[in-house]
């Protein structure tokens, strides 16, 4: 029970930060945004009803009850879900397999846009509360937001280990304050609780028609953090997340939203910022400080999520090797990816300056998350149909309901395409193109390399016929295919006419599971005459290092000394060929990514002084 409580408190700071800061802007956008609706009892009741049932249907039912069942060895998230499908659905034809990979990758690409917008809108909306206290400080809100964001991104390389223990208590205080503020206003206007009944939402949509449909885009802002609940499942487990949601987060959110609704009916003039309207004048400054702290924590969770997503994409072969730094010796999940960090910082600050207010940013926010949720629903359908063999009639009815809700929110959010919703879609399209180009380019590259080499069996037979000179020592050659001889070894043998007395061919394989247990991580095959084949299997959440592989291989008879090994790598220079399945601009993009990828020496933590790189020119 004590461990459960600790996990629940930790989950508060990481999992619920995004959805927990939605009260800062969700209600405001419904009544004061670009498509704001008139403030009257019917509209307030209708919006609150839609908001309540969105939280119940999307978060409580869809995500916490159903989608969280679809875990990949305990891990959640759209890439983990895609990997689960690809691993198990072997019977899927080529077109269906490509469809699943494509939508899964596009869903992951959408999260990059979300990771850029969330810090911008969250911190900006919190600091906008300053003008409630001192309107003269209005012009300082943008500079203050940029300053906070710069500090946030500059501190990423330190990791969250030191301050992470504060996240849970701060967000706990945040939710308690949310609930108390809302409850005070509800007690003044208890009739607002009638909005819980769903017919108010239905009548709102019927009476307001197209305008009411447009407001759905603002209503959706209340559930934008739902995907994080699923993505962070592997860190905290299903039970702590579900319990924390049911007994703290959901009640606090509902109380605050109902409180804001009651405030609007009592004081419509507060529509420009109903959240801060709940706060007594003496508490505005402390509330701005608490809100800013909560939004920084929510932003931190999104940034960390982008780092984790990038690492998964690298391990699964959808992005080139990038520098990944572990910021904690105890927790493997705490990483820092400099390239992702600086890209996010530039994009986030540009959004703050370009849009200028959280209200304008809200138009860009929803479409990325609605599209991701739509893709998660589709992937879940395939899991339930192909892996779990659910009753098709029941499954089809359930999926149709979820899809109708997802499509309604997506349509409402996409209606703001020219008001900023284009931004996350462009980011997603760029990232999707990058990932697909890298995957296809690597496939073409490996095909070219395979056509120029020998199988291990052919090579061993040729050695028996013409044995080369062997010098004392140990050599490791990295190979992309465990059944083929790396070109680096063939080139070395052709030019130097010599091989080491002990040679090991190392192949690193990323499995479509989060982690591989140590007893299955390394396989050593003795080929004879001093040759070995070593296959190291890692999960997509793990970080392979040569020292760990050598230590595990030592138990299987490979007695190589790390300080005595010569490591041979091939360094390919990519040139565009005449005939290829890739267009010329994608070939050039792949070549640029290949040149800028970090070397295998850095990625696998090889000792630089013991590495020999052999250059190869390859046409694709």
Curated annotation (Swiss-Prot):
The keyword Cell inner membrane applies. The keyword Lipoprotein does not apply. Transport of potassium into the cell. Likely operates as a K(+):H(+) symporter. This is Probable potassium transport system protein Kup. It comes from Chlorobium chlorochromatii (strain CaD3). Pfam families: K_trans, K_trans_C. GO terms for cellular component: plasma membrane. GO terms for molecular function: potassium ion transmembrane transporter activity; symporter activity. It catalyses: K(+)(in) + H(+)(in) = K(+)(out) + H(+)(out). Keywords: Cell inner membrane, Cell membrane, Ion transport, Membrane, Potassium, Potassium transport, Symport, Transmembrane, Transmembrane helix, Transport. It is a multi-pass membrane protein. Its main location: membrane. The chain crosses the membrane at residues 7-27, 44-64, 98-118, 135-155, 166-186, 201-221, 245-265, 278-298, 335-355, 361-381, 394-414, 417-437. It is found in: Cell inner membrane. Belongs to the HAK/KUP transporter (TC 2.A.72) family. InterPro entries: K+_transporter, K_trans_C, K_trans_N, Kup.
